[in-house]
Amino acid sequence: MCSSDLAAVIHDPVTTTDELIPSGETSSYRSNPLRLAEFTLSRRVPEYVGHAKDIAAQEAERREGKLPEYLKAVLSAVGDAAALAGTTQFGSAVFANKPGDGSAREQAASCQKVLGGFANICYSYATKRYRSNCINWGILPFTIDEGTPFDYADGDCVFVPDVRRAVEEAREDIPAKVIRKDGSVEDLMLHIRGLTQDEREIILDGCLMNYYAARIAD
């Protein structure tokens, strides 16, 4: 299972790769992924990096066997928090209507992953290359149906039960729950359509590098 906290919600018609990770002043940091990631969405959602880092820190605590109060509250909204804590990973997510327009900039996806990004949610991807980059970095490329309202906000959380099994079984329709900041819970149907077998295995392995490492080891 995974739970993705919405660290950025962008309702512009299109979100470009230059908005996801600006060019120019960032070019000197291309060999420093941690420093480069500090610029993610800096021109569009300045709060994104801090929010994503906070979620990543809480996930690190969960991995150590702790259960931060925020994560406990999220899990309590959908079930037994103590039972779910051991099987639910937490990460950040970005919603944008149509992300990835512009140059084929790998860092537009890799910087999200460096900050603990688990998922993107959109109506469609502007380019196949950006979607592929997300997959190669282990970011779940969710879509929702055109016309489905997405009136959620930064800080709301998307809980996706059995997502690993859904990817393994090539399911394209994946029911999820959205836990709003006020504690209310709503259903949301997510989709991951058109994944190849290799793409599914890349996501399951965590990223393209892990995918190749596993096959070299075999």
List the predicted regions and their residue ranges.
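Fe-S-dependent hydro-lyases/dehydratases of central metabolism
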Residues: 1-218
